[in-house]
Amino acid sequence: MPETSSLLPYTDTKPVGAADFYAAVNATFRFILHEQGLEGLRRYWLDLGRKYFAPVTRRWSEGGLQAVAEHWRAFFAAEPGAEVEVTHGAEEVVLEVRTCPAIAYLRAHGREIVPCFCQHCHFVSAAMGEGAGVEVRVQGGNGSCTQRFALAGHFVQPQQMEDIATAT
């Protein structure tokens, strides 16, 4: 993928993406889960983080937590309906997701949400951070959550899947 000046791994002429994409994402997760099981879906998320988001990983590696904060600000600015506060502290970047745009869209349009949907935030972000020495912990989900990013070794405990809510 060619390098761009964008903080995101893609370029778009629109300031905000199309929300109907969330239905396609949910359907993709459902299909992979049905065909390959939970471990197959988690492998997909890890591949997405490692491969598709590789340009972001490079920026994080070069720019540290400042680059992490910049990425998430740009990411959520392009997400329709997102209500997210990104704070960059001395040791952590914290995302307070008050309204997850994907969950809000899927609910508003009567879609059955894949129960493990919110786990993708952990697996994709963890894979993005691997090559940059950045770790993530996710707490909550099902429409709102807290995501904490820090340099590797900062968190004492590994991510607990039970800390990530089941989506409904």
Where is each model-derived feature located?
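N-terminal accessory segment detector
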Residues: 1-94, 99-119, 127, 131, ...
